Swiss-Prot record:
Its biological purpose: Involved in DNA double-strand break (DSB) repair and recombination. Promotes the annealing of complementary single-stranded DNA and by stimulation of the RAD51 recombinase.
Family of this protein: Belongs to the RAD52 family.
Regions of compositional bias (Polar residues) in chain numbering: 235-245, 269-291, 304-324, 489-499, 521-545
Cysteine pairings via disulfide bonds: none
GO molecular-function term, one example from the UniProt record: DNA binding
One of the GO biological process terms: double-strand break repair via single-strand annealing
DNA damage keyword on record: yes
Signal peptide region: none
Composition bias, Basic and acidic residues: 449-473
Record-given protein name: DNA repair and recombination protein RAD52
Protein's cellular compartments: Nucleus
Length: 573
């Protein structure tokens, strides 16, 4: 350990021009330590009791669990096990108590301090000696080391090295007390077992957080306010259900029922198809016990036929044929949103008021009633049609107390028929059994089929190539050059795909021959005398003998044939 001091007597670096290294003196301050290096403060050790001694010894003999051990890559592709500094401090507080141990920095020394040229980067290494003392006076000392390479400045280098060195010395001192403080990490058998254990991800709970008391108090008040509001809303709901009046079963609805039932109105739809019984005629009867159920044995409503005789007569029949008030038994606690909803379900009798009419039929009835001088009220029209249907059904002797207007037609089975038979089936649906059904599996003998469509099997390529309708296509090769003139190659429009590209414009057979850009030197020389024969005839007298002209004519024809052959070759290429 280097203990050289500078000339001023204070702790500081001594320059060394040879190695550019700074050596710091040993930490010795008379304020904290005396000349012998022992603490100058008054320390009174307190011995452990027998129970405390056994408890601490029992905990120190245990082995660290896998949640306390960490791994980092080491040399040779191996992993190095270690315990993190904050975990070691928590274990020391758990075993010795938060006031049962203390740590001291005994000495600090800079091993090397290098500056890298003009870059200002710093590399240094620092070692410290740390002592840990427990309550009964037992202590352990060990060294710690910290280093850094290429630090930006001195402050960063010293901060990192001192913290790393002190933490390293602290962990090395604690491991001297027992296995649970890190000494078990040097046993490879224990490490091999720890590596096989897989831990679940840690879950943090709200109770484990240390919160600000003011924030916690605000959150508690907010929760209480929300709870009170929910409780008050629940009480209001129960009060509203208890305030629903009881209906009068014999004499109809009372005045109070009418006032309350006006609030319970059905949803008024934009279309005229919403023909429901007015909600004012409904009575809600709340039983005293929760075991009472709805009475399903309701009497069918008597139908009174009406005779269409004008608008006044329609209004009378509508007032006389108002349905009897119904009692809805609401059992026990119920939700207000169900009772005071706009979408209350209709009974069978109420559904019969619509008479199975859709929008189109209802509009037709309104239009017809206008022509007859009747009313435009869709409810009255629907009720009149309902009464007429009841009258017709009663006259025929058929009685249906629940739904007299709608006569269900038995469902006909689905049939497959041909297009010719479809019109006949629509005109006479009762004769569906007489019409022959269409056989979807019928195979016409006039259509040649190369594959069996009745089953799903893989098709080989050879079977497709041997199909009877696939005829081999012959590739048209270049035309042979003959001594006589021959037209260019003709390509049919059906086999244009054999050309290998998409043809645009006229087909090749109708295109004009390509322009001959290059000509043989011999042919050009051979054709020159023929072309220049006319100008030369002016200077030389021509022979008028026809026999000589006939002798010269085949030579000219031969030369023209040669030119046509050359044109054909150019088109092929």
């Amino acid at each position: 350990m280097n203990t050289n001091n500078n000339s001023s007597g204070s702790n500081g670096p001594t320059s060394n021009s040879a190695s550019s290294m700074y050596n710091y003196t040993h930490f010795k301050d008379t304020k904290y330590k005396n000349a012998q290096g022992t603490p100058n403060r008054n320390f009174q050790p307190v011995p452990y009791t027998e129970e405390e001694h056994q408890r601490i010894q029992y905990l120190l003999d245990k082995v660290l669990g896998p949640e306390y051990v960490s791994f980092r890559p080491g040399g040779g592709g191996q992993k190095v096990s270690y315990i993190e500094g904050w975990r070691a401090l928590n274990l020391a507080n758990e075993i010795f108590g938060f006031n049962g141990w203390c740590s001291e920095l005994i000495s600090s020394q800079v091993d090397y301090f290098d500056t890298h040229g003009n870059t200002g980067r710093i590399s240094m290494g620092l070692s410290v000696v740390v002592r840990i003392t427990i309550k009964d006076g037992t202590y352990h000392e060990d060294f710690g080391y910290g280093y850094i390479d290429n630090a930006k400045n001195k402050a960063m280098a010293f901060e990192k090295c001192k913290k790393e060195a002190f933490t390293d010395g602290l962990k090395r001192c604690l491991r001297c007390f027992g296995n649970v403080l890190g000494n078990c990490l040097y046993d490879r058998t224990i490490i091999s077992k720890i590596q096989k254990v897989r831990l679940p991800a840690p879950e943090l709970e709200a109770d484990n957080f240390h919160r600000d008391p003011l924030i916690v108090q605000r959150e508690m008040k907010k929760k209480q306010t929300v709870g009170v509001n929910i409780h008050e809303s629940a009480e209001n709901n129960t009060d509203n259900t208890n305030n629903i009046p009881k209906g009068n079963d014999d004499n109809g609805a009372t005045n109070s029922n009418e006032n309350n039932s006006n609030n319970v109105h059905s949803k008024q739809k934009n279309s005229a198809t919403s023909l429901q019984t007015p909600i004012s005629n409904r009575n809600f009867n709340i039983p005293n016990s929760t075991s009472q159920h709805r009475d399903n044995n309701t009497k069918p409503r008597a139908s009174h036929p009406s005779q269409p005789g004008g608008p006044q007569q329609h209004s009378k029949t509508s007032s006389n044929n108002t349905p009897a008030p119904k009692n809805y038994d609401i059992v026990g606690d119920f939700d207000d949103s169900l009772v005071f909803s706009d979408d209350l379900p209709m009974d069978d009798d109420e559904m019969s008021h619509n008479d199975g009419l859709d929008d189109y039929e209802l509009q037709m009835l309104i239009h017809k009633n206008r022509q007859n001088g009747g009313t435009d009220d869709p409810a009255l029209i629907a009720r009149s049609s309902y009464a007429e249907n009841n009258e017709n059904s009663n006259s025929s002797g058929e009685v249906n107390p629940t739904n007299n207007s709608v006569q269900e037609i038995p469902d006909q089975p689905a049939l497959f028929v041909s297009a010719k038979r479809a019109d006949a089936l629509q005109q006479a649906p009762k004769d569906a059994t007489k019409i022959p059904q269409f056989d979807a599996k019928y195979v016409s003998p006039n259509i040649r089929r190369t594959l069996d469509h009745s089953k799903s099997v893989p098709v080989r390529r050879s079977e497709i190539s041997q199909a009877p309708h696939d005829k081999p296509r012959t590739n048209i090769g270049p035309p042979k050059l003959l001594n006589r003139a021959s037209p260019g190659p003709t390509i049919s429009n059906s086999n244009t795909n054999n050309l290998g590209k998409r043809m645009i414009g006229l087909p090749p057979s109708q295109k004009p021959p390509y322009k001959r850009r290059h000509q043989d030197a011999s042919l050009s020389q051979r054709s020159k005398p023929d072309e220049t024969s006319q100008p030369s005839s002016k200077a030389v007298p021509q022979d008028t003998n026809p026999s000589k002209d006939k002798e010269n004519q085949p030579a000219r024809v031969a030369s023209s044939k040669n030119l046509e052959d050359i044109n054909n070759m150019a088109q092929v290429t």
